[in-house]
Amino acid sequence: VTHYRITKDVHGESEVTKVDKDSLKNYSDDYHSTFIEVAKFAMLSNKDLGKKVNYIHFGNQCRFLLETHARSNYNIENVTDNAIKQIVSAYEVPESSESQVRRMLDTINSLSHGMSFNWDYVSQIPAKQIQQAARTLLWMLTNKDSQHVEAMTRNISGFMRICRTWQDDGLGV
């Protein structure tokens, strides 16, 4: 029996991919597939980043990842600025990187409501800022639990190596 996954890309086009046997063992498919999408978005070059038409939806995906992970592992219910102390403590974020984590939270939370009354503000957020938020999130998760991130991204060639270069340059850079 062969299994396939059908997803929509950022342009609204359907993508059909074969699902390998290891992926079928992962019971949290939404979390895993979202993790993969965010990781691929974080790895985009500046040239390819400019081609993303619907980059804003990655803010929601980042929030979904962080909320799911924080709630499941650290009983942190809301990943807002009010929970910054809990977040930096749970994820062992160095004090020097706290402001970058705060910017990441501000970015992903401002995008979590989609197109709404604040669309004028949201539409002004550049793709690079959202990508930096994604990189900060992925760095933070890697810093705390690199085995988790490696398991989630094992099919993305070079991800852990690239993620470590973000660490060397500072959070989300």
What are these regions, as identified by a protein language model?
Residues 1-75, 81-95, 101, 105-109, ...:
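C-terminal lobe/lid and adjacent interdomain/linker elements of RecA-like ASCE P-loop ATPase modules
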Residues 70-77, 119, 141, 145-152:
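Long, hydrophobic, amphipathic alpha-helical segments used as structural scaffolds
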Residues 95-147:
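Histidine-centered, metal-coordinating catalytic motifs and their short helical/loop contexts
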